[in-house]
């Protein structure tokens, strides 16, 4: 039974998660994901330039990583929550309605990384260089994406009377509107722990910590991305234990709790191995490989240069 909620402060949730403009339905969940992609791409390009690359190269890789990541995130969600789409009375086509919500971060990261590998290979950039540059941006994107769950009134914890308790409405996913009571007011399911907010704030803090540690200690190539996985999974493990919405379980624990624990251990081991290696960035080097960025990919070979004769004419000297 839900505890009695005393009067006081609470975090309100929207009663509308979508708007219709003519025949087009705009989901706020999708807008949050899009905003996260834009912010993450901006920070990634900025950090990638500091590692010897260019904005154009960063965007080329991002254009591969993003669609792969979205597909991977959806696949992970559908596989781990297949009962939502398959079985008696279920609609399998719902698995394709990504705008209604449902992306698994681990599928997004894994398949997105595969897309980034393709883009990095095509642009002559080492994957570790791009991954290290992208790590804080991924956390910013995840922090923004969690607000899509706020619009959908989902991903909350146990009932609570804390001052920052989250109001949750009974939402109709088909219409993007809260279900109304007999007197015409939005139906409230209760007040719960705002786990979406906890995770969003954790991602912001982890992003700031990553940037600080990368600058302070010049972490080795690939270790920044490994540390991103360590930090995120540490928080996600705790937040999964707090959540009260339905999820498939293994031995009494949510699937994502197990995944977070296993990835934390694996990423921690990788970080300890890679942290002392040479850094994946150096804007001061003029060697053929600028710490992971192959200058020959742009047609420039630092072993070749131009000289000017006494008449001002330039001659290419191999």
From Swiss-Prot:
Q: Where found, per UniProt?
A: Cell membrane
Region of interest (Disordered), residue spans: 293-318
- In the UniProt record, which is one GO cellular component term? plasma membrane
Identify the EC number(s).
2.5.1.145
GO annotation (BP), single: lipoprotein biosynthetic process
Q: Which family does it belong to?
A: Belongs to the Lgt family.
Q: What does this protein do?
A: Catalyzes the transfer of the diacylglyceryl group from phosphatidylglycerol to the sulfhydryl group of the N-terminal cysteine of a prolipoprotein, the first step in the formation of mature lipoproteins.
Q: What is this protein called?
A: Phosphatidylglycerol--prolipoprotein diacylglyceryl transferase
Species of provenance: Paenarthrobacter aurescens (strain TC1)
């Amino acid at each position: 039974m839900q505890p009695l909620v005393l009067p006081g402060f609470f975090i309100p949730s929207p009663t509308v998660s979508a708007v219709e403009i003519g025949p087009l339905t705009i989901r706020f969940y999708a807008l949050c994901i899009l905003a996260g992609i834009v912010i993450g791409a901006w920070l990634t390009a900025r950090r990638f330039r500091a590692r010897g690359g260019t904005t154009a190269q960063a965007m080329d890789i991002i254009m591969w990583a993003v669609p792969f990541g979205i597909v991977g995130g959806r696949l992970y969600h559908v596989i781990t929550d297949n009962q939502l789409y398959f079985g008696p009375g279920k609609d399998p086509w719902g698995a394709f309605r990504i705008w209604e919500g449902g992306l698994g971060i681990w599928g997004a990261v894994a398949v997105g990384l595969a897309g980034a590998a393709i883009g990095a290979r095509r642009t002559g950039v080492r994957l570790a260089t791009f991954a290290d540059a992208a790590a804080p941006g991924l956390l910013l994107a995840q922090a923004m994406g969690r607000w899509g769950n706020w619009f959908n009134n989902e991903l909350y914890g146990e009932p609570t009377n804390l001052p920052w308790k989250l109001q949750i409405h009974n939402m109709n996913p088909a219409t993007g509107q809260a279900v109304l009571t007999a007197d015409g007011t939005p139906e409230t399911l209760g007040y719960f722990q705002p786990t979406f907010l906890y995770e969003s704030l954790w991602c912001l803090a982890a992003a700031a910590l990553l940037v600080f540690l990368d600058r302070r200690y010049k972490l080795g190539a690939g270790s920044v991305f490994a540390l991103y996985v360590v930090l995120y999974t540490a928080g996600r493990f705790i937040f999964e234990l707090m959540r009260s919405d339905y999820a498939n379980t293994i031995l009494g624990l949510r699937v994502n709790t197990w995944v977070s624990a296993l990835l934390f251990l694996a990423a921690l081991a990788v970080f300890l191995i890679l942290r002392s290696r040479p850094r994946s960035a150096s804007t001061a080097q003029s060697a053929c490989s600028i710490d992971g960025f192959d200058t020959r990919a742009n047609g420039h070979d630092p072993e070749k240069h131009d000289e000017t004769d006494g008449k001002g004419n330039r001659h290419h000297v191999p």
